[in-house]
């Protein structure tokens, strides 16, 4: 399979405790909250423009890199897999990628090429970062690049078909049309 390259727009820099979130209505990145606990984001975290995931937000992506990037920075990213999870009852996919313009990452093309410890950092972060908010996050599993690409294509289509809806309208409609993606 050819490399799966996409541009990811950074919302949250590596090591930040600030939860920024892209606001599709205004096109701005807003401070959503400060993380409730002692955790910080283990890698850069962003979204893929023109996609819509089942949670009503753009498709998310962790970007493995040695440096933190400022919010709104576009990072060329090579997708190496995905993480399927349920966040507060909604499917919330996280693509996993590496910075594509850093030679230190040129040999990483799939999740198994990454140090296991780095993957564990993300898994532990996602399992614990909402505990003090009394919200549940369930990790369903790691997925390969082919799965990630299919999910990306689904999210592109969801944006084309339903991007005009508000987040609440989208979720209400999808809970009826695709209840398998929701546990509420």
UniProtKB/Swiss-Prot annotation:
Q: Which cofactor does it need?
A: Mg(2+)
Protein residues bound to Mg(2+) 1: 55, 60, 92
Please describe the quaternary structure of this protein: Homohexamer.
According to its UniProt record, where is this protein located? Cytoplasm
UniProt key word Cytoplasm:
yes
Entry function: Catalyzes the hydrolysis of inorganic pyrophosphate (PPi) forming two phosphate ions.
Q: Which UniProt keywords apply?
A: Cytoplasm, Hydrolase, Magnesium, Metal-binding
From what organism does this protein derive? Mycoplasma genitalium (strain ATCC 33530 / DSM 19775 / NCTC 10195 / G37)
Catalytic activity reads: diphosphate + H2O = 2 phosphate + H(+)
Residues at which substrate binds: 19, 33, 45, 129
Keyword Phosphoprotein among record annotations: no
**A single GO molecular function term of this UniProt record:** inorganic diphosphate phosphatase activity
Query: Mainly localized where?
Result: cytoplasm
A single GO BP annotation from the record?
A: phosphate-containing compound metabolic process
Query: Which family is this sequence assigned to?
Result: Belongs to the PPase family.
Its Gene Ontology cellular component terms are: cytosol
The entry's protein name is: Inorganic pyrophosphatase
Matching entries from PANTHER family are given as: INORGANIC PYROPHOSPHATASE
- Broad enzyme group: hydrolase
Sites where the protein binds Mg(2+) 2: 60
Q: What is its EC number?
A: 3.6.1.1
Concerning PROSITE patterns, the annotation shows: PPASE
Q: What CDD domains does the database record attribute to this sequence?
A: pyrophosphatase
């Amino acid at each position: 399979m050819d490399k799966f390259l996409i541009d990811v727009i950074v919302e949250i820099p590596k090591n930040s405790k600030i939860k920024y979130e892209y606001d599709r209505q205004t096109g701005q990145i807003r401070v959503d909250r400060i993380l409730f606990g002692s955790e910080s984001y283990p890698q850069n975290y962003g979204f893929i423009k023109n996609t819509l995931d089942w949670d009503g937000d753009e498709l998310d992506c962790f970007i493995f890199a040695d440096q933190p990037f400022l919010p709104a920075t576009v990072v060329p990213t090579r997708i190496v897999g995905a993480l399927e999870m349920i966040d507060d009852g909604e499917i919330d996919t996280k693509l996993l990628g590496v910075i594509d313009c850093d030679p230190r990452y040129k040999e990483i093309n799939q999740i198994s090429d990454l140090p296991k410890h780095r993957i564990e950092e993300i898994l532990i972060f996602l399992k614990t970062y909402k505990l003090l908010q009394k919200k549940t996050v369930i990790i369903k599993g790691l997925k390969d690049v082919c799965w990630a690409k299919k999910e990306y294509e689904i999210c592109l289509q969801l944006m084309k078909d339903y991007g005009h809806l508000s987040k609440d309208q989208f979720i209400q409609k999808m809970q009826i049309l695709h209840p398998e993606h929701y546990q509420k």
